[in-house]
Amino acid sequence: MKRIFLTFIALVFVVHSAFAQATPKPVKDLKPTVILISLDGFKPEYLEKYPAPTLSMLAKEGVRAKWMTPSYPSLTFPNHYAIATGLYPDHNGIVANNIYAPEFNETFSMSKREEVGNGRWWLGEPIWVTAEKQGQRSAPLFFPGSEAEIAGKRPSFWKVFNDDFPNFERIDMALSWLDLPKTERPTMITLYFSDVDHGGHDAGPDSEDVKQAIARVDQSLRRLVEGLKARAIFDRVNLIIVSDHGMARVDPRNVVVLDDYYDANQAQQIGWNIAWNSSMVHIFPKPGMEDTIYASLKKAPHVTVYRKKEIPARFHYGTSNRIGEIVVMAEEGWSINSRDRVRPPQLLPDGSVKYRGAHGFDNQLESMRALFVAHGPAFKRAAVVEPFANVDVYNVMAKILKLKPAPNDGNKATVKALLR
């Protein structure tokens, strides 16, 4: 009996010790700090449509934009890197999710891990490189570009992207960085969550999948807020919560098959390089074939076909050598594909077609609008501001961190609109 009692006391001591070790200490000597959080595919209207108590609290107490305008094309990699650098995709090198680069005759895609980590693709200067160059430490977690050495610099902390890495563990990793000694602690941290984007793609923006995904990411935000409060720094850390783009409802039967608009027997003769992105396509014709291909594709419905030099200025798109000489843009709700890539639509139990979601369309469309919410000592409180372009966020972060910004495309008026 005595042995059982002593064992019990020892167990209580171990549990108490573990709890004590797990209880964070207040963080002291905190420098101006930014945590940039990306909720991929989160439409601003979701805040009113679906329950998200933590995000709603941050938006109510802090500052939010009516919406943030993504850069064209409204795809994941181009827009994350536009936010990070303040440069439009036309200037930052990441002109799409799938890219053909004539300068080294190579292709890039999100799934080509070796290329994702190769700095030759990533132009400009992301905020974490700006911080490292000026003596601050950075920790971009799963943010596009963070795996590469850019301008001779790497972040102090980074991790190879793993979409299966649990959301709560991402939060805990960020909090652990804040627990580091002052000399080791990063001032620029990023987090990335793909749940809402996956839900939107799988079932469309008006779906139970999206509702559940928002609940999950909001729980993660709650864990972050509670972790900051436990360290007595919730009101001392600047949180910036953004999305890269919105989401449009798509009928999977709405496909423009490019093969139908040129002579397949001439395919080898034409020999074009194509960078496929579903909602838009870059075509690099062989010399002398541009007019033929352009004339053929102009016959296709539900797309707009531009010569590179004729892309409207409002897109800020058309000077990079990684943009095709011909660019085909899909109408909202349509996709572009080749015959060998088209798959039959998924059917629901009642036999009807399952609608899905897509993005990458005209960045001025309401369905493509992105989220911006910020909370912290640098930001205005209980404010709603007019829409602005996502390339403006870089200057906002640089101002908070007291960094000299690299050359960028952002409008500094947004800094004044958001900050105290």
PLM features: what roles do these ranges have?
Residues 36, 54, 216-259:
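Metal-dependent active-site segment of extracytoplasmic phospho-/sulfohydrolases and closely related
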Residues 87-205:
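His/Asp/Glu-rich, glycine-adjacent segments
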Residues 7-16:
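Bacterial N-terminal signal peptides
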Residues 27, 168-179, 196-237, 397:
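A long, amphipathic alpha-helix that forms part
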Residues 236, 243-286:
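Acidic/histidine-rich catalytic neighborhood
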